[in-house]
């Protein structure tokens, strides 16, 4: 069953990789756009990464590794999909940086203990059959004092769950968004843990895509669209983000966000 799940994930992402045009990827937007609050949260806590050895788990098209390489990190980009690793290497070449690329299973990493200064993962854990195993592996390969930085979707918001059901063609059958209580496990594993959640009122943008702009969720990935069109969306997003800040101060509201971002120190 586990191998079958991983193989389905590999096939899905290989097919996606075959359709990616690296020339259209604006790397910095995935970290610096106002509509990338998860990565902005992570960047604030990463510190100076120049010369640091960074493992990018589930590297996808390589936006993360390329961005960090541009900041001076030595990046190892890994993905279970060989197609995605190849795209990441192409993106690095197109941006004039060097990264190492490897196919890897995040639940069984082929790296020694205490290897990396930083482990980064975006939208990975909800594709993993057992996220806790992947978290243990992140912890294992980090040097003492190293940081695991990652973000993923949560399962609790009814609006985003409707979107997930509609966008079946651009999602895998085995995806399992996280329960916010996984934070308790992360806190038990790492010496320090900081986290926040993002996108509550700001999810109005998804509703606008569907109800007003008539964007087919099976033809355009909304979570890519918010980055690609960040300049157009910025005025609306920034107004709604202020409301998110108010909502998250209310009891239990953080769990109804779309995404959670975590920085955990070994």
Please give the residue ranges for each predicted region.
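A C-terminal cap/extension of S-adenosyl-L-methionine-dependent methyltransferases
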Residues: 163, 197-266
């Amino acid at each position: 069953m586990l191998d079958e799940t991983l193989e389905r994930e590999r096939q899905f992402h290989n097919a996606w990789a075959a359709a990616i045009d690296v020339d259209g990827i604006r790397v910095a937007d995935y970290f610096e756009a106002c509509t990338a609050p998860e990565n902005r949260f992570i960047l604030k806590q990463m510190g100076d990464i120049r010369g640091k050895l960074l493992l990018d788990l589930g590297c996808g098209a390589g936006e993360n590794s390329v961005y960090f390489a541009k900041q001076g990190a030595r990046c190892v980009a890994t993905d279970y999909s060989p197609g995605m690793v190849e795209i990441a290497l192409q993106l690095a070449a197109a941006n004039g940086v060097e990264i190492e690329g490897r196919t890897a299973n995040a639940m069984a990493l082929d790296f020694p203990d205490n290897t990396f200064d930083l482990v980064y993962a975006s939208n990975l854990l909800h594709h993993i059959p057992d996220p806790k195993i992947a978290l243990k592996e992140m912890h294992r390969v980090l040097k003492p004092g190293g940081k695991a930085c990652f973000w993923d979707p949560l399962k609790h918001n009814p609006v985003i769950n409707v979107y997930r059901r509609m966008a079946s063609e651009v999602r895998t059958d085995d995806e399992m968004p996280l329960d916010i209580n996984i934070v308790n496990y992360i806190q038990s594993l790492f010496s320090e843990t900081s986290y926040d959640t993002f996108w509550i009122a700001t999810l109005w943008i998804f509703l606008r895509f569907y109800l007003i702009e008539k964007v087919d969720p099976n033809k355009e990935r909304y979570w890519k669209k918010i980055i690609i069109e960040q300049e157009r969306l910025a005025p609306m997003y920034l107004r709604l983000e202020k409301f998110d800040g108010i909502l998250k101060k209310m009891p239990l509201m953080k769990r109804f966000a779309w995404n959670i971002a975590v920085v955990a120190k070994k």
